């Protein structure tokens, strides 16, 4: 039996109710060199053969004999062997909720002052509201007291269930108090505002807040830290003929959320916050827990817009989503933390698997600002996914683009593919449906203009980092991806700039149908067992600028028609470092190379390599402090020089 190292005692809050959660921690269980992430941990128990982890209202069972260690930060020795030290800290990030720290990040979306902007009307201050005190509804257990501007509304009350009809413009409501069996339902022909001020409301049989009007619903959260609001729905809804009831907070029209308070939503049926138009978060702290299978914490049919505030979602139902839109999704500011803990499920009607995803859009997604942190721990789980596939008898169409324009993105997945082993045809080709974990996925083209993107996928086989079914175009920004399967995978890549590090522990670093590179830094690392640092499938590979370092057991070489020279070298010995040097021994580029590579293959391409000049390849047995051994002396005569062979 392997020894289990328990490095800390765990007594952490259970994230199961729509209450203000205390800081929670993830643990990292190392099993056979792979790391499984278990989040929202409450406690851990042991028997001689089994370890039980209690978390978020359920349990995870792990085999003791197969566990190497448990840590509060990931146990990982591979990166220190294969990456230069400057990259190590790029993967030391975690995704967890922390009330104290998250509250400090609440910053409102800057006001839009241009009346022609599509989001101008989403700001409450840009509208005229009825004078006076508004309509105050105070819930008190089994009843509700309604005061204020009653001339503008018609009220029906059944216990603590309040229904309001109004045709007036600019009506505003203030909801407070508590009830374990209450709700607020609004029929309005005009826009309306609902302020939540210390409201604690549960509706066992339907939505807690339900707006059946097509106009905007302004949802303002006040009260700060001490007077937060919490809403909970039940696992079953009473049907209402001709009406949608998609979630704990539901509106037929747009939902615009603002205010300086905190809102906690506990959803059990479908969605936490849902709009048949779009949801726009401008300010406040919004925390949504969703327990439903295939449920969505925040859902916008046409769009989800996050411009400010703090948005946190936790989905533990199978195939659950954090933020999900049937069309567009846009982030321009704020802090998003999205965690999914459910597994993939097979959907008979679609003849395919549906898996969890922290942020999902069916069409285009634009990440133009803010900070986004995603963690998906279940089988087939994904961090960010844009677009969808349309399959016809003759062709598959990829719809929906993903664009990065300045956002800081941190993604982690800890799940494996489901089923673990795919079916194969008589030729050994994988067939049949499966759910594979992905860090970031785009159906159509992915464009990276700026920002910082960090992806870590450590669960196991098929855990890919960044994938596009079409091309990935990189103009700038910083990209770091470290995964079990392909670190980056695309139909092709046009790289004009940026700083990109890609690393795989069991497959190719960068698997792309073509690569056309004119600028930036591309450092890509593949597994030591027959895998490639850079695999272009033998297709177009042209280099006219920038720098490439590719480390693997094999690599593809640029076409000789490239205007920038490259050197591809093989080495059949175990060394800890390799360097490209000029003819006098001055090192131009040095990289770490673990002993496990045999053969070792490295591709260098940069502006220092000139046709007609002479160079050396130097090796270092133990460290860069050793006296180097000259492996190759050579002169570059063509755009691509190959030294040695497989």
List each language-model region with its residue ranges:
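Hydrophobic h-region of N-terminal signal peptides that target proteins for export
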Residues: 9-17
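Structured surface patches comprising rigid loops and adjacent beta-strands/short helices at the edges
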Residues: 38-46, 63-75
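N-terminal targeting signals for Sec/Tat export/insertion, comprising classic cleavable signal peptides
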Residues: 28-52
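Cleaved targeting-peptide boundary
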Residues: 18-25
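Positively charged n-region of N-terminal signal peptides that target proteins for export
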Residues: 1-4
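A composition-driven surface/loop motif
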Residues: 77-646
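Extracellular interaction modules
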Residues: 37, 59-68, 537-543
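Charged, amphipathic alpha-helical segments
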Residues: 36-42, 68, 559-568
């Amino acid at each position: 039996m392997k020894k289990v190292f328990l490095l800390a005692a765990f007594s952490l809050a259970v994230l199961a109710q729509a209450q203000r959660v205390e800081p929670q921690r993830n643990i990292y269980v190392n099993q056979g060199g792979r790391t499984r992430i278990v989040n929202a941990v409450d406690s851990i128990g042991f028997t001689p053969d089994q370890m039980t982890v209690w978390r978020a209202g359920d349990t995870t069972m792990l085999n003791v004999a197969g566990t190497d260690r448990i840590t509060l930060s990931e146990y990982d020795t591979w990166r220190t062997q294969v990456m230069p030290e400057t990259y190590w800290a790029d993967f030391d990030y975690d995704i967890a909720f922390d009330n104290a720290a998250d509250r400090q990040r609440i910053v409102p979306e800057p006001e839009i002052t241009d009346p022609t902007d599509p989001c101008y009307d989403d700001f409450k201050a840009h509208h005229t509201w009825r004078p006076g005190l508004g309509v105050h509804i105070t819930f008190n257990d089994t009843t509700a007291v309604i005061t204020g501007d009653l001339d503008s509304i018609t009220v029906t009350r059944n216990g603590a269930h309040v229904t309001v009809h109004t045709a007036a413009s600019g009506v505003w409501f203030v909801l407070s108090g508590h009830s374990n069996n209450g709700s607020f339902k609004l029929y309005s022909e005009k826009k309306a505002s609902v302020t939540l001020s210390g409201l604690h409301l549960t509706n066992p049989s339907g939505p807690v807040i339900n707006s059946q009007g097509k106009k905007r619903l302004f949802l303002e959260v006040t009260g700060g830290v001490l007077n937060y609001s919490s809403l909970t729905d039940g696992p079953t809804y009473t049907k209402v003929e001709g009406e949608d009831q998609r979630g704990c907070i539901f509106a037929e029209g747009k939902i615009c959320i603002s205010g300086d308070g905190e809102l906690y939503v506990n959803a059990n049926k479908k969605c936490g916050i849902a709009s048949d138009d779009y949801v726009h978060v401008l300010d406040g702290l919004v925390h949504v827990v969703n327990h439903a299978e295939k449920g969505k914490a925040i859902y916008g049919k046409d769009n989800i817009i996050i411009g400010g505030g703090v948005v946190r979602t936790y989905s533990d139902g199978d195939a659950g989503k954090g933020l999900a839109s049937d069309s567009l999704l846009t982030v321009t500011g704020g802090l998003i933390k999205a965690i999914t803990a459910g597994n993939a499920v097979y959907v008979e009607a679609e003849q395919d698997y549906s898996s969890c995803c922290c942020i999902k859009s069916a069409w285009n997604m634009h990440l133009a600002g803010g900070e986004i942190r995603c963690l998906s721990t279940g089988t087939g789980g994904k961090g960010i996914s844009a677009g969808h596939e349309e399959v016809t008898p003759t062709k598959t169409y990829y719809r929906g683009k993903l664009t990065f324009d300045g956002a800081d993105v941190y993604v982690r997945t800890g799940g494996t593919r489901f089923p673990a082993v795919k079916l194969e045809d008589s030729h050994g080709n994988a067939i049949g449906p499966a759910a594979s974990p992905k860090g970031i996925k785009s159906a159509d083209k992915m464009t990276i203009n700026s920002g910082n993107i960090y992806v870590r996928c450590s669960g196991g086989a098929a855990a890919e980092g960044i994938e596009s079914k079409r091309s990935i175009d990189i103009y700038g920004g910083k990209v770091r991806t470290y995964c079990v399967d392909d670190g980056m995978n695309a139909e092709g890549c046009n790289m004009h700039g940026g700083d990109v590090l890609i690393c795989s522990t069991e497959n190719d670093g960068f698997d792309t149908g073509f690569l056309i590179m004119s600028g930036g830094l591309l450092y890509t690392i593949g597994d030591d067992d027959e895998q490639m640092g850079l695999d272009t499938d033998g297709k177009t590979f042209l280099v006219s600028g920038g720098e490439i370092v590719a480390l693997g057991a094999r690599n593809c070489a640029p076409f000789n028609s490239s205007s920038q020279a490259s050197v591809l070298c093989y080495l059949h010995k175990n060394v800890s470092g390799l360097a490209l040097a000029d003819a006098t021994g001055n090192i131009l580029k040095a990289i770490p190379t673990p002993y496990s590579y045999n053969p070792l293959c490295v591709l260098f391409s940069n502006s220092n390599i000139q046709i007609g000049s002479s160079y050396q390849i130097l090796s270092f047995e133990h460290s860069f402090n050793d006296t180097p051994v000259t492996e190759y002396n050579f002169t570059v005569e063509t755009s691509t020089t190959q030294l040695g062979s497989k």
